[in-house]
């Protein structure tokens, strides 16, 4: 198609330059590091991770009151002796700008991450226990949860009190993680990803199957307000 614009200005030139090449559609199916998200050298066996997920779900169902909205959690750690989990235990403090005022506001209560120091005995002997042990040898691990996200679903655009480690267990090419201005796919291949969720971020599942990650909070500093 030959189109001759009636006006030749900077906008026409910008679009013409953009039309001169095709966007990269291959690398979006891979991990690309960026500010706020890095792949660590530590790696686990993806087959054993997926087997452990099925084994744990036979022992305990996903929890949470927002499962119909696509968010479900399975707590892998607990306070010593804990047997019941509140909605706040499964989610916890975050901040967001909710409306046209663009004012940042807190939601939910702060969770003392260091209190969640004990692996959930319901899942003792699973590969997830080994994962937790290996993480705890290297980092100050707080709450560790298995988080499930339904298809065609997205979290809020928010920030957390602390960074998190992500280990994808089940994923698809349409499952993406965004931290501030950087977006990338996290393949489910046993890799461990550092995500600086102290910055604004979200997880979205634009694929046709569920997305399941192990998410471990890094309890270096306890935010108190």
List PLM regions with ranges:
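Fe(II)/2-oxoglutarate oxygenase catalytic core
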Residues: 1-157
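Intrinsic-disorder/low-complexity, polar/charged segments enriched in Ser/Thr/Lys/Arg/Asp/Glu/Gln
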Residues: 35-39, 162-164, 213
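Residues that flank catalytic or metal-binding motifs in active/ligand-binding sites
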Residues: 142, 161-163, 210
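Residues in well-ordered beta-strands of folded domains
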Residues: 145-147, 168, 178, 204, ...
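A short hydrophobic beta-strand segment most commonly corresponding to one strand
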Residues: 165-168, 192-194, 208-225
């Amino acid at each position: 198609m030959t189109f001759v614009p009636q006006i030749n200005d900077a906008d026409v030139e910008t679009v013409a330059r953009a039309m001169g090449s095709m966007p990269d559609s291959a690398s979006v199916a891979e991990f690309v590091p960026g500010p706020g998200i890095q792949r660590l050298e530590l790696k686990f066996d993806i087959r054993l991770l997926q087997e452990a997920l099925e084994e744990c779900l036979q022992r305990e169902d996903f929890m949470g009151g927002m499962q119909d909205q696509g968010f479900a959690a399975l707590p892998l750690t607990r306070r010593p002796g804990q047997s019941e989990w509140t909605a706040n235990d499964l989610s916890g403090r975050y901040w967001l700008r909710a409306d046209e005022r663009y004012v940042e506001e807190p939601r939910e209560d702060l969770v003392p991450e260091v209190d969640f120091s004990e692996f959930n005995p319901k899942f003792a002997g699973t590969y997830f226990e080994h994962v937790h042990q290996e993480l705890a040898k290297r980092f100050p691990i707080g709450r560790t949860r298995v988080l499930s996200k339904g298809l065609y679903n997205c979290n809020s655009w928010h920030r957390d009190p602390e960074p998190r480690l992500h280990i994808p267990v089940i994923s698809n090419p349409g499952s993406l993680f965004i931290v501030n201005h950087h977006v990338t796919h996290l393949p489910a291949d046993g890799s461990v990803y550092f995500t600086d969720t102290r910055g604004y971020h979200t997880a979205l599942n634009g694929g046709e199957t569920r997305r399941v990650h192990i998410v471990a909070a890094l309890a270096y500093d306890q935010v108190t307000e």
